[in-house]
Amino acid sequence: MLRTVKLNAGYKELHILFDVDADIKKNSITAVVGPNGSGKSTLLKSIFGLATVHSGQVFLNGGEITSLPPHTRTKLGIAYLPQTDNVFANLTVEENLKIAAYTVDKEEVKDRIDAALDAFPELRAFMKRKAGTLSGGERQMLAMATALVRKANVLMLDEPTAQLSPKFAEIIFDRILKLRDDLKLTILLVEQNVQRALEISDNAYLLVSGRVAFNGTANELLEHEKFEKLCMGIVD
C-alpha cells in the first residue's frame, strides 16, 4: 500500500535517511524503532511531504507521491500526527472536528464526526471544552479523531504516548489496535516504548544512523537474540 524506494531524505542540505526501502502493508501496524537521531520521525515526515527528499521515491497504492505537497497527500488519505501541536489548542473539541471536515461535503460532516466520536467516545463529554484544557491523552484522542473525520486510511503516529501516564498510554495502544481491527486503517507507529510498540505491531523497521538495519515481523525483532543491542543501535 505504502512504499519508499531508495529514499534519501533530510532537511535542506542535511541528510538523515539513506537508501531506505520500506513496504508498509495495508491494514497493518508497522513499528519504526531505533535509537534517538536514527531518522524515525524523518521517515514519517518524508512520507507526508514535510522533509526534503534528496532522491528516491514514495508510492501510495502504486502511484508515486514523492513530489506532492502535504495537503494533497492528506486528500489521498494520509494523516501525520506529530507528538505535539497536533490540535488547535484555542478551539473547542467540536471546532477541531469541524475544521477537520473542511473538505467534506456538508451532508457528510455530521456522519463523519459521529463516526470519529464512536471510535473515541470519551470526547463526547468535552465537545465545548477548549482543546488546550484537555489532558495529553485526551488531546491525542482528539488528534486521531480528526484524522478519522478526514477519512484517513493511513495514519502515521509520532510518539503518541509520550509523557502520558502508563494507564492512559495503554488506552491509546488499545485504540490503535481497534483502528486497525475495526476501521481497517494502515498505521505507521514511532513510539518511545519500543517493547509495547512491537507487541501491538505486525511488522517492524529498525533504523540505525538513517539506514534500515532490520525489517521483518515485530515478533522476529522482539525475539531476536540481540534485540536490546539492536534497539540501541549496536549492529555487529
UniProtKB/Swiss-Prot annotation:
Span of domain ABC transporter: 2-234
GO BP: L-amino acid transport
Domain of life per record: Archaea
Protein name, entry field: Probable branched-chain amino acid transport ATP-binding protein LivF
Organism: Archaeoglobus fulgidus (strain ATCC 49558 / DSM 4304 / JCM 9628 / NBRC 100126 / VC-16)
Gene Ontology molecular function, alphabetical: ATP binding; ATP hydrolysis activity; branched-chain amino acid transmembrane transporter activity
Its job: Probable component of a branched-chain amino-acid transport system.
Keywords recorded for this protein, A-Z: Amino-acid transport, ATP-binding, Nucleotide-binding, Transport
Pfam families in UniProt: ABC_tran
Protein family per UniProt: Belongs to the ABC transporter superfamily.
Residues reported in the UniProt entry to bind ATP: 34-41
